Structure formats: C-alpha cells, structure tokens
C-alpha cells in the first residue's frame, strides 16, 4: 500500500558573506544534497534552501576596506557562492540572503513575540569602545598580550598560543584591531533573550532520542553548567536590522541568521503557488524540518534556535544533523601548503563528482572529522568509480551495439544474481536515510565487485571470438549492462551528472523502484566515455593554484596592514622635526605674501610649474615642483607664501628667483600655503 510522500524542509548552515566557499563548506552541502536527492528519488516532497549570512561587524568593516557599500559586497559574494554551489550540483530550491525584506519582517516579528511573552530583558553593560572609530568592539576585534602566557597579538576571547579563554578586558595592552587605538570602557543598554526560561523544554527536546548522541551529551553539559541569558543586541555602527522601537540598536547577527532559514523559505513561497509558509512553520506542523550544520555552531542551533522558535509560537526542528571538520592530508587546511582549497579553485581542475563520491565514501552519521587525503582521493575514485563501476558498462556496451544493433537480450539470463542486487535496495535505502553514506558506498562497491567477477568468469571477449556463442554473448553482456544500471540507480544521489549520462546511454530514466525489473529487449545508445579518471597532475595543479592564491592574498593583506600602520602614524612620526637652529638663522629668512599672476607647465619638465609672482611692486619668476598636485589654472590669482631672499638659481628652463612654500610628503599630497583674507602681496610673514 502506497504511503503519502513526506513533506520535508532541509537547510544548510548559511555561509558568511565575506569570503569564498572552500572544501570545508562543501562537506556539509554535499552531505545535505545527497540526502535530499535520495529523498526525492524515493518520491518525497523536499524543499532544500539556503542563504548567505550577510550581517555583522566583519562585513561592515571589510566593505569599508574595499571602498564599497556592504550591500554591494554581499551581492558580489552571493553571486560567487551560488556559482560554486551550482558547480558542485547542489540542488537548492532557493538561495537567498539574510539581508532581505522577508528576513527583516520575520526577525522583527519573532523579537516582538518574544518580548510580548516576557522572554526579552534589558540591562546596562560595560564594553570596550574604540574612541577613534566611535564603535563598540566585538571580542575578535580587540588584540593584545595574553594575560597567561604573555603571547602578543592575541584576540580578545582566547589565546591561539596557549588556549586560554578570557574577557577582552583581561588582555594586557589591548588595542583595537580596527584602528589601533587603545580602547576605553563604555556603558550601553543591551537586550537579552532569557534562555533559562526554556530549560525544561530543551531538556525534553534533548530526550526525544532523535538528536545525535554527541549533540545530546554536549547539551547535557551545558545544562549542568547552567544556561545564561543571551545578548541579542549590538550598538551602532552595525550592518544589520535595527531593533523595533529602539534607536541605534541592532539585532546581533546570530539572532537573524537562523531566521534566514525561514526568510529563504518565505521567499520561495512567494515565488510558488503550491507552497504554504505556515504549513511548514506553524507550531503543530506535520511537515519535517532538518538542519545540516557543522559542529562549531551546535550551541546556537540546539539551544537558542529551538528556544526562540518555541517562544515565538513556531515549530522546532525534527533534528539537527551535525558533521565534523575537513582536514587535508591529515592536517588542518593550510594556505601555505596549498591545502586551503576554494571551491572555485577545485572546479578549475577537477570533476565535482569526484569530491562528491569521496566525501560520501567517508561520511557517517557521527560528528567525526573527515580527512581529504589527496592520494587516497585519487586512488579511490579511480579504483571504485572508473575501474569497478563505469568499466562494467564499457566492458559490455561495445558487444551490444556492434553485434546486436544496441538491443539487449530478450530474456534475462541471471535472475538470482539480479535479485541479489535488488535485495540490497532496502539496506542501502536505510543507510541513505540515516546518513551512513560510507556504508552505503561500501555496499554498492561490493555489488560492483560481484558484477565484475561475473563478467570475468563469463569472459564475453572470449565468447565474441567463438562460433555459435552469439546468444550467450548477448545475454552475458545484457546482464553486465543491467547490473551497472542497478548500481547507478543506487549511486544517483551521490553522482547526479554521471547518472544523467548513464540515463542517456541506457535510454531510460533511473528510478529506485524502476530497477526492480531488468531491461530486456531494450535498445541502448552507442557507448561514450561516462567518466574520466583523476589525473594526479591536475591535483598538483590545484594545489599550486591554491598556493598562488594564498600568496596574492597574503601580499594584499600585508599591503593593507602597512597602509593601516602608515595611516595610524602622526605627521611627526613620518617626518621628525629637524635639529634646532638659532633665532638669527630663522630671522635671516625673508618670507613674503605673493599673488600668483600666471602659472604654466614647463615643456619637457615632469614636475615643474613656472610662476610669475607679484610681491608688491615687484614681479618674480619662480619654478616650483608641485605639478603633480595642481593644474596651472587652479593656482592663478591665489595668494601664497614665498621665500623672497633666496639667492636666484639658474635652471635649465630659466632663472628661479625664490621658493613657494608648500606642505605635504610629495606627489599628489602637496598643498601650497594660503594666507587669510586681508593679507596683501609684499607683506612680510613674521
């Protein structure tokens, strides 16, 4: 008896909109996409959504550094993110942004509901404040010396050197990472979500049995240490949504970020008539909601998020699926080693389906870190996908197309073997459902081994040379093609592009239930190469490009730091005061007010302008090296200051009878001295 399709809403954690997608991000998105594609393959109604997390201080400051608005920056980043996800065949139904009208409305609604229900409190707190930038500083925007190990240049929340955690006020000699200024303490009213009121509900949710064991255990630790009120506000300047009814107060990015799941779905509902927002988010919804996230954000998704939803009258997630981190070659991803690999860099060199397969082969339902060993990656994909699975088709297709006009045998010669392959469907289905993808892949490759063993034993290449073996050759090759068909149906959630090419070859759409019966008397198309093996040289080229990208980024960062350091210097730091002189020496310099009668460029001189100056009854010709800062027509008629008793100097272009005074380091940064109104040509400057 057929059951109604499940209605499922699936989300991935929202990538932050200030940088590129890398292979660490791709683990989660590939994991979720495989699960979503499996559910769709089984006939379930799935909506798969995501968005960019587009608010917060880091985005505001990076946009300032780039000289563009935050809106311009997040739009460009969103375009890049969506291109990368599409490159890996991540089948989102909608990709949106937390900086959207839908998200603003929902964040305001949830906040006001929480406030109305008594879950929002306020109090005055003291925070570090940058007096130059006039902004409060998040922990990661304060640097100083670790109070424990005395390591310098440590962030305001923890020490990378010794691992100590502390308050930013504990740092020795704290400095603003934004301006370099010494921060001061300043009071401000902040708003808090009263999380402790939800402890009983959260404990019950934890005991539901659906959460991963590691997540439930971690939540128990948090319960034992005591839940704390959560600061959900930030002061201006801040890029985000203003809190309703408040002035210069904004929602902390982590309040509106998970609401972005709802905002993205709301945006999708506005595009489609068949979707109802309330059906999926109302308190008593019978639909299913699942979040795929990394282990670094469990706290927000397992405590704050379900509590916020419950307090505002919405449903809670059915589950939060947590994964570990990605390491490369057994170590943390490294820019200097070229193992911090951006998604776009990978796509420049390798087939995305290779990574999809490798991640699937190593994923399970636990919160384990996954190591992308590049040598093993190459060997496993080439061995499993090319040698075992795709080779099964290539070994048999030629006989069918050349000898039998592309037609499979009228009867199926190995029903028992085929039934063994079909019997594995329920086991593999359960493994997909429970996210035990690695075990599912092992089941599939074990079947591939059996299929290849059968072909090795029957040796169709030998049968092709023997008279009277035509029917057996067709039957054996047809068995091989059909077993390949079953394997590809099972692999379709993992390798959708390979599955699509297989469907074109088989002249049939692959479905989970459809492969229950073999293809007989069915016409296939001429075999074309379905999948290319990984060339180790392409892996090396990917690493080299990653190193080059890192070097360019480092050079740009160092340049920006140098410019920041230079900008923080005073003019006296840049150009210290000269040695003292006696008053008589100064008195010997005769400075006079001069009116610029005319100014013109000097032919063949890169820096010089030629001036005619009126100094009150006398005209002087002066050459001055300020061409890079001024156009001649900008200066004519202005008053300025000149040294009038400087000994005339004969130059290539004529006699210079004095010196015009200007301030600045040089180049375009030069400014002539201009007296106030009332000064007259010829007056002495005292």
Swiss-Prot record:
Record protein name field:
Methionine--tRNA ligase
GO molecular function terms attached to this record: ATP binding; metal ion binding; methionine-tRNA ligase activity; tRNA binding
What is the required cofactor set for this protein? Zn(2+)
Q: Could you provide one GO biological process annotation from this protein's UniProt record? A: methionyl-tRNA aminoacylation
Q: Which InterPro entries match?
A: aa-tRNA-synth_I_CS, Anticodon_Met, Met-tRNA-synth_bsu_C, Met-tRNA_ligase_1, Met-tRNA_synth, Methionyl/Leucyl_tRNA_Synth, MetRS_core, MetRS_Zn
GO CC annotation: cytosol
Q: Which ranges carry the tRNA-binding domain?
A: 585-686
The answer to whether keyword Disulfide bond applies is no
Where is the protein situated, by its record's location annotation? Answer: Cytoplasm
User: Which positions does the motif 'HIGH' region occupy?
Assistant: 15-25
Quote the cofactor binding remark. Binds 1 zinc ion per subunit.
Species source reads Aliivibrio fischeri (strain MJ11)
- Annotated family: Belongs to the class-I aminoacyl-tRNA synthetase family. MetG type 1 subfamily.
Q: Which Pfam families match?
A: Anticodon_3, tRNA-synt_1g, tRNA_bind
Q: What class of enzyme is it?
A: ligase
- The entry's Zn(2+)-binding residues are 146, 149, 159, 162
Question: Keywords for this entry?
Answer: Aminoacyl-tRNA synthetase, ATP-binding, Cytoplasm, Ligase, Metal-binding, Nucleotide-binding, Protein biosynthesis, RNA-binding, tRNA-binding, Zinc
